[in-house]
Amino acid sequence: MSFVVIIPARFSSTRLPGKPLLDINGKPMIVHVLERARESGAERIIVATDHEDVARAVEAAGGEVCMTRADHQSGTERLAEVVEKCGFSDDTVIVNVQGDEPMIPAVIIRQVAENLAQRQVGMATLAAPIHGAEEAFNPNAVKVVLDAEGYALYFSRATIPWDRDRFAKSLETVGDTFLRHLGIYGYRAGFIRRYVNWQPSPLEHIEMLEQLRVLWYGEKIHVAVAKEVPGTGVDTAEDLERVRAEMR
């Protein structure tokens, strides 16, 4: 099947300035992400950035760049600019791979594209089982609950679903009902065009989760369990050192 990968790579970061260019064992982080995307079999891979230094690093590695504005409020808005500049048809399958995921498995990039292509829906994503209480109660681990057909009912930083009887006895263990949302998305280009014209929803402001805008406006998001769980993403200096060690 044919699909396009777009990798948003914003230069500014509160915790890690210049994050896309941080060195991981001799290569900029964004180049590692580009290489994982190439392994997925994508027809085309575009790095969307707002900084010339990132563009130069990607082009030096043989990658394609689309320069975007620096004032986007989300990665999806940056994708929308690329969709318009490249003139993708509405039915083009686009996978959004985060620029700070140098250890993302290529197999799940393709998985989310295939899941979207097989369904009459505008958006798809992935999740992974949660087995430990620490992750289940961590607000930085976004939880998702699904309906019988694998479509998202809700995403939250809260512990959902709340296992009333189990948690009344102890908060030390969790069952097999929890799923952690993974930050990889597949979209049809036409859906991205519609999404950016919707006003932000109250729920996404409360949870700080932009995918809640989709549910707010009555659209569906298909969620599959990932074939392989991604390694550590890079949000902090500690994450960076961990990734450097794991990728040696």
Swiss-Prot record:
Its main location: cytoplasm. It is found in: Cytoplasm. Its EC number is 2.7.7.38. The keyword Transferase applies. The keyword Heme does not apply. One of its GO terms (biological process) is CMP-keto-3-deoxy-D-manno-octulosonic acid biosynthetic process. GO terms for molecular function: 3-deoxy-manno-octulosonate cytidylyltransferase activity. Pathway: Nucleotide-sugar biosynthesis; CMP-3-deoxy-D-manno-octulosonate biosynthesis; CMP-3-deoxy-D-manno-octulosonate from 3-deoxy-D-manno-octulosonate and CTP: step 1/1; Bacterial outer membrane biogenesis; lipopolysaccharide biosynthesis. Keywords: Cytoplasm, Lipopolysaccharide biosynthesis, Nucleotidyltransferase, Transferase. It comes from the Bacteria. CDD domains: CMP-KDO-Synthetase (cd02517). Belongs to the KdsB family. Activates KDO (a required 8-carbon sugar) for incorporation into bacterial lipopolysaccharide in Gram-negative bacteria. This is 3-deoxy-manno-octulosonate cytidylyltransferase. The lineage of its organism: Bacteria, Pseudomonadati, Pseudomonadota, Gammaproteobacteria, Enterobacterales. The gene is kdsB.
